[in-house]
C-alpha cells in the first residue's frame, strides 16, 4: 500500500511444483518497518544439486525450514498435487487476514485431514498465526516452526523475545500446549551469508504437547518494550 511503517506480511498459496520451487505452501514472512522478523532464508549459490534430483535434500528447499508445521513428524512434499486449498483473503482499514488449508501439501504419512493456517495482521499492533487441525492418527509429535534472523531469548518461564534490526518482539503462546526450543542454523553458503549479513539464523520449534487428534494453537507476535524477559 505504499507504506513501510509497522507490520507487513506476505503468505504463499500455490503448489509445490512451481518455478524455482521450495516446499513452502502456506508459509509467510513478517517485516516491521521494512525490516525482517520472520523470514524465508532464500536460496544459496546455485549448484548441480539445486536443479537435480537431490534438490529437496537442500535445507532451504524444505518446509521444515520455513514458517510451517511439521505434521506427525512429516514435512511437505514436492509435486503439483501438494497444494493449497480453500484460500480466503480479507482486508479492512485495521485488519488483513489470509487463511488456507495446507493439509494437501503433505504426503499420506502425515495423517492429516485438515490443517487450517490463518494469518491475521492488526496494523501497527500485532501479527497472529492460528492453526486449527484434524488428524486421522497421532504417530509422532507435530511441531510449529518459525525461522528468524533475530536473536532469540527464551527465559526460565518460557517467555520468548526476538531482537533484531526491526527492534524487539514478544512471541506469545499457550505454554500448556506448546513447548518451545531453538535450533541454530549455521550459514556456510556465501550467498546466504551476504543476504542476511550474518553467519547464522535461528529456527524456533514449538512442539504440540500433548499430541492431539484435533486442536487449535495461536502464536502472537507484537512489539516488546525494552525490559527484561522476566518483567
Outline where the language-model segments fall.
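Amphipathic, alpha-helical segments enriched in basic
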Residues: 5, 9, 14, 44, ...
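CBM-like, beta-strand-rich accessory domains located in the C-terminal region of large
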Residues: 46-231
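Carbohydrate-active enzyme catalytic cores, enriched for enzymes
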Residues: 1-38, 90-91, 209
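Active-site-proximal substrate-binding groove within the catalytic cores of carbohydrate-active enzymes
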Residues: 41
Amino acid at each position: 500500500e505504499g507504506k513501510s511503517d509497522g507490520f507487513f506480511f506476505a503468505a504463499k498459496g500455490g503448489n509445490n511444483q512451481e518455478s524455482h520451487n521450495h516446499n513452502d505452501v502456506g508459509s509467510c514472512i513478517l517485516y516491521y518497518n521494512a525490516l525482517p522478523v520472520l523470514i524465508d532464508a532464500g536460496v544459496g549459490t546455485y549448484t548441480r544439486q539445486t536443479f537435480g534430483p537431490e534438490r529437496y535434500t537442500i535445507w532451504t528447499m524444505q518446509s521444515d525450514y520455513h514458517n510451517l508445521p511439521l505434521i506427525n513428524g512429516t514435512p511437505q512434499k514436492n509435486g503439483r498435487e501438494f497444494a493449497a486449498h480453500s484460500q480466503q483473503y480479507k482486508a479492512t482499514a485495521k485488519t488483513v487476514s489470509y487463511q488456507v488449508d495446507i493439509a494437501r501439501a503433505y504426503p499420506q504419512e502425515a495423517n492429516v485431514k485438515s490443517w487450517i493456517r490463518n494469518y491475521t495482521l492488526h496494523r501497527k499492533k500485532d501479527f497472529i498465526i492460528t492453526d486449527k487441525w484434524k488428524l486421522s492418527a497421532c504417530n509422532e509429535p507435530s511441531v510449529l516452526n518459525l525461522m528468524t534472523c533475530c536473536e532469540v531469548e527464551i527465559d526460565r518461564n518460557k517467555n520468548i523475545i526476538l531482537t533484531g534490526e526491526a527492534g524487539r518482539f514478544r512471541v506469545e503462546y499457550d505454554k500448556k500446549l506448546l513447548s518451545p526450543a531453538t535450533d541454530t542454523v549455521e550459514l556456510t553458503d556465501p550467498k546466504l551469508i551476504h543476504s542476511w549479513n550474518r553467519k547464522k539464523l535461528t529456527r524456533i520449534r514449538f512442539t504440540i504437547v500433548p499430541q492431539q487428534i484435533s486442536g487449535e494453537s495461536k502464536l502472537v507476535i507484537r512489539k516488546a518494550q525494552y525490559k527484561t524477559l522476566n518483567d
